[in-house]
């Protein structure tokens, strides 16, 4: 019995020591800084983001590599302090800023559309005497963005940064912006970008769905860019328009005398077949250089379709009229002659008119 009571008391002492150790550890742990509730809920975080430098745009990967400056501003009355002579604000940078942020409430805001880890990140923190806080974060990273090639090469795209609040729903922390935040986001947009012209900056709200039907505050900061279409004319559109002449020339090169065609259909078929292989090679080259053009309907795919249609129509004309003389057998050689003359003049108008119309639709 004595052994059992000793074992029982030892077990209780062991459990008590574990409890005291856990209690001591939790008592010394620092609680997480609470939300600044002096202004009520939600805590409004003024947000601005500018593209400071755009290194490259990869349309095939649908991404861009850029350096962005994210500015967050909010008020925390607990951080107010008596104004010192000659100092407008307290300034912290890099490691000092991170150490100061560890002791205060900071909104959990992240750039959600980055790809991989940032190659560079730094912080700058300013605290004003009235409790106003301004946090500036510079980040260099690759950003996922969407590209719509439907109006290529007259298209406009948007380089976007997705700013999201984590951990708190939009009823507790809300991202917002005013005109000065939009002006900050638009600053630096006059910088040059190879093959693109920079345009306006837009900010839009779009809440992000969370667990249990909660919504998290989210802003999209979008920089509009317009493609310089002259860069795509020489490698893509000049060959496409030139290849349209192949089936037209194959039909036009024949001549008719007294209702009879003078050039062998076999020679003209060789021209069309050669043009077909040329268009296939051009199609393969364009899709290799611009894979995104083959994934959607756009001006380039329509012009390729027009090329294939013109080649097929030319081959049908050569076989039906030049090789087998089907119209002559059915309606006579003079009807066939007039039909051929009509095709010689109508086909170029239809083909080239359609090609120009496709370009005008993309430009509209």
Regions found by a protein language model. Give the residues of each.
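Soluble non-transmembrane domains of integral membrane proteins
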Residues: 30-222
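Tryptophan (W) side chains
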Residues: 12-14
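Juxtamembrane boundary at the C-terminal end of a transmembrane helix
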Residues: 357-364
């Amino acid at each position: 019995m004595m052994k059992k009571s000793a074992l029982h008391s030892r077990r209780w002492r062991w459990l008590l020591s574990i409890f005291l150790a856990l209690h001591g550890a939790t008592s010394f742990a620092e609680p997480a800084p609470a939300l600044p509730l002096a202004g009520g809920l939600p805590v409004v975080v003024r947000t601005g983001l500018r593209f400071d430098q755009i290194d490259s745009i990869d349309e095939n990967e649908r991404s861009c590599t850029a350096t962005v400056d994210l500015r967050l501003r909010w008020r925390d009355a607990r951080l107010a302090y008596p104004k010192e002579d000659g100092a407008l604000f307290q300034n912290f940078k890099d490691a000092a800023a991170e150490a100061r942020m560890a002791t205060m409430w900071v909104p959990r805001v992240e750039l959600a559309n980055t790809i991989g880890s940032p190659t560079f990140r730094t912080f700058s923190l300013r605290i004003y005497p009235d409790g106003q806080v301004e946090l500036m974060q510079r980040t260099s990273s690759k950003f996922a963005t969407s590209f719509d090639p439907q109006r290529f090469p007259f298209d406009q795209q948007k380089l976007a940064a997705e700013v999201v609040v984590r951990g708190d729903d939009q009823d507790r922390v809300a991202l917002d912006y005013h005109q000065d935040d939009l002006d900050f986001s638009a600053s630096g947009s006059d910088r040059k970008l190879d093959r693109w012209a920079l345009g306006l900056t837009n900010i839009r709200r779009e809440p992000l769905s969370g667990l249990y039907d909660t919504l998290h505050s989210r802003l999209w900061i979008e920089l509009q860019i317009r493609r310089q279409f002259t860069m795509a004319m020489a490698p893509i559109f000049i060959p496409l328009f030139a290849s349209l002449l192949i089936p037209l020339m194959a039909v036009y090169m024949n001549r008719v005398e007294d209702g009879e065609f003078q050039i062998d259909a076999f020679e003209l078929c060789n021209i069309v077949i050669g043009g077909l292989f040329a268009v296939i090679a051009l199609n393969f080259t364009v899709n290799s250089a611009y894979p995104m053009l083959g994934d959607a309907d756009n001006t380039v795919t329509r012009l390729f379709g027009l090329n294939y249609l013109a080649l097929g129509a030319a081959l049908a004309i050569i076989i039906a009229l030049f090789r087998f003389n089907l119209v002559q057998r059915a309606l006579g050689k003079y009807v066939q002659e007039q039909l051929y003359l009509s095709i010689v003049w109508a086909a170029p108008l239809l083909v080239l008119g359609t090609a120009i119309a496709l370009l005008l639709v993309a430009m509209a």
